[in-house]
Structures are given as structure tokens and as C-alpha cells.
């Protein structure tokens, strides 16, 4: 039996003492899921991590990833979670992946949107963010504004569109939620019912994406997104933070940055 000690865990990750299934084995992440849709992700060190995640050392993650067939049944044991011949122990160190809205938020400058990285649905980032916005993005932003104003919104119409484990529109909505929290337009009280009128989101998008979106509505975001908003107040760090954000997934980073830009424009009162 090989014992794995996580380096770090998110304090908002679900309680590991419940029944899990192996939901996906990837180069940088291993997903475990409950019947109710709770997600626990084992992340490879150096790849950032999400609000439902534990971070494993590179060598230990690679050994675990390479040693799994994909059909193992996770077992909860006294020390942690057993996966095949590996036991991932309960983490000892935790951190809070929740945004703290700054007193004086610094906006994302328009120049940072002049990037060639591809979004999932609207071409290069520079084109997707240019005026006039594509009609679909204008409608998406209008729907987000209505939701912030308290209008009951069924997000199933918008989610699940585009490629990826977290589809493009889902990432764009995550970016808009990040902007809303950053600028103080959402808080714990207003964020809690954000998806209340959306029924079962897993009917239209992936379970992984649903988990990230529900966390985002409550102000919990993956570490690269938090690094990005922190870096907006420190010009020396902004370029590196944006590069790290844009490196996420195939188009996830670009779609998220596009969403933040759309949310920022909305909250600054720009048409």
C-alpha cells in the first residue's frame, strides 16, 4: 500500500467521509464524485487548484494517475481515501479559496484583452471582446445584469454551450461571477440563491462545471482566478497572472477572462 500525504487542501472541499465514484482521471486532476454531485478533485502540484480540491505532490500524483485503471471504486478508510493500491490521507493543511473584495478594486485595463488566445465560441479573445459585442454575448451580459438586479433566472438556457469539461459559456459565467464578487455586486446573501431557479443544471452541462459554478456564486474560485484578481492591484504581477489564467484548459482561461471583462463593463455602467 502506497501512502500519499496531500500538500494542501481547500477548506471548502466536501467531507471525504462519504461514498465516492471515480469520475475522471486526467493529466493534472483526478475527479471523485458523490451521488448527489459533490466533487472532490485531486490536483497535481503546480497546476493550481479549485475550491473542492486537494493538492498532491507531482511525483505522488503521477504515480497515482499512472496506477489507476479508471474503474476503481474509492473506499473511505480511517486514514483517508483508498484508490487501488494507494491511500490518500486526510489533509493536514487547509486554505480558504474565497475572494475578499478589495476596498478599492483596480479595473482590468482594456489593453489586456488584446490577446490572440482562442475563446471556445467567439474566436480570438481580442475579437470576442471588441465592440460591438457579438449579439449572443450582449444577451448573456443582459441576463447576468437582470440576475444581479434580483430577476429570477433559469441559467439552463445558457449553460453547457461550447467545448470542454467546463463548457465555454459556463467559464464565461464564472468570469462574470468573479467580477461581481470583486466589485462587491455579489455577497454571501445575494450569491446563495443565484442558481435557485435553474433546477438541475446537470441536465445541460457537466457535473464538474456545475460544482465550479455553485462555488463561484458563493465567492469560491480556483487559485489562478484568485491570483488574477489579486494581481490587478499590483502591475508587476498582472502579466504573469493573466498568462497563468489563459493557460487553463483548452479555452477555459480565455472564456473566463472574457466573462470577467463583460462583468466589469456591466458593473462600470458601460454599454
Curated annotation (Swiss-Prot):
Protein origin, superkingdom: Bacteria
Q: What happens when the gene is disrupted?
A: The deletion mutant cannot produce oxamate during anaerobic allantoin degradation. However, the levels of oxalate, produced via a glyoxylate shunt, significantly increase.
Question: What protein does this entry describe?
Answer: Oxamate carbamoyltransferase subunit AllH
User: What job does the chain carry out?
Assistant: Component of a carbamoyltransferase involved in the anaerobic nitrogen utilization via the assimilation of allantoin. Catalyzes the conversion of oxalurate (N-carbamoyl-2-oxoglycine) to oxamate and carbamoyl phosphate.
Identify one Pfam family in the record: AllH
Family assignment from sequence similarity: Belongs to the AllH family.
Q: What is its EC number?
A: 2.1.3.5
| More info | Oxalurate could not be used as a standard substance due to its unavailability, and the enzyme reaction was performed in the reverse direction: the synthesis of oxalurate from oxamate and carbamoyl phosphate.
Q: Name the gene.
A: allH
Q: Which organism is it from?
A: Escherichia coli (strain K12)
